Amino acid sequence: MANIPGYTYGSAAPSPVTMRELEELKQAVLFTAEDEKYLKMAGEVLKDQIEEVLDLWYGFVGSHPHLVYYFSGPDGKPDANYLAAVRKRFGQWILDTCHRPYDQAWLNYQHEIGLRHHRTKKNQTDRVQSVP
């Protein structure tokens, strides 16, 4: 497991979404074993380019005030430490999406990520004071 602060893959609480529901969702969006195969191939291409992908994404977020707002401190300015902490986990998420099996551990962590994007758990992982 990657040594990234706040990266809790494999130890996240159980997702309320069941594996059966995940399989039904995959069917509904036509996600197949072939998609998984190509994600693994993409992961091989991306593994040495993660920083470039993150630079592009952070440039996009940073160019939209309504997006960077969610990384702002009480002073209204982007919190560089918060952005850096999230960046490390986002890079690992890209690799996980490409290489990890879509099993219960994966599902649990995706649910955890969702909670961290909602006022339920936003700001807690990095102990920051940002907008909910």
Residue ranges and their predicted role:
Residues A2-F60:
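Intrinsically disordered, low-complexity terminal regulatory regions
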Residues L25, I50-P132:
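Heme-based O2/NO sensor domains and their adjacent alpha-helical segments
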